Amino acid sequence: MGSALLTDPPPEKPRPSQQGRGKAAPGLDLSPGQMLRTRQYWLCAGAVCCSTPAVLLFSPSILKLGMERGLDEKSALWSVVLGSVGSAAGRLLMPMLSDKIGRRPTDMILFAVSLGLSAVFWFAQGWAVVAVYAGLTFCYSALAAVLPALSTDLFGFPHAGVNYGFLALGQSVGSLAFPLMANLWGLEQGRHILAIAGAVGGFAAIWALRPVQPPRAPRPN
């Protein structure tokens, strides 16, 4: 009796990840070469790059920063502990939210929150350093966790692994380029300015992101 109740395949509920395409619209199965020729790839990779400075510019020296801003060494260690908690929470919670409201709105929320926290972090003192840093690690890890689903939504499933790898190159570029720029600019002020600029750039890139249009079928002669 149970088998009589099953349908093959089971009906699929509409999801935000379908990018607003109608049910009759063909799915996208872009190869890495095709993906690299799209505007959407460069916007996504740019957003990934811009997500890095808010955390990676500060994580190597977060203990020192906490002590410089009024914490003793034992208290400053909580920035590492709560930063890890924030990272884990971001990876678990925000992909769930993106399943409900869509990847693009989720990423825009995360970049907006990261922007606000980066501005507050510039002036944070004492335990506020710990709290704000935990919030920044939440946003950073959440953006990374949503990226594979965003990649699949935009470019299709068959080449999802390689396509995601190309998108993740943005993180590698950001982790190298932003510290270099901060060192050239001056570590203390430059790090905060670059973190704010990165959040603005990431928000703008995701705001400009639109679904990849499927190739048009050739017109019959």
Language model: regions and residue ranges:
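C-terminal ends and interior cores of transmembrane alpha-helices
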Residues: 113-125
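Helix-to-loop junctions at the C-terminal end of transmembrane segments
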Residues: 91-102, 186
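A late C-terminal transmembrane helix in Major Facilitator Superfamily
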Residues: 154-187
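C-terminal membrane-cytosol helix-exit motif in multi-pass small-molecule transporters
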Residues: 1-22, 204-211
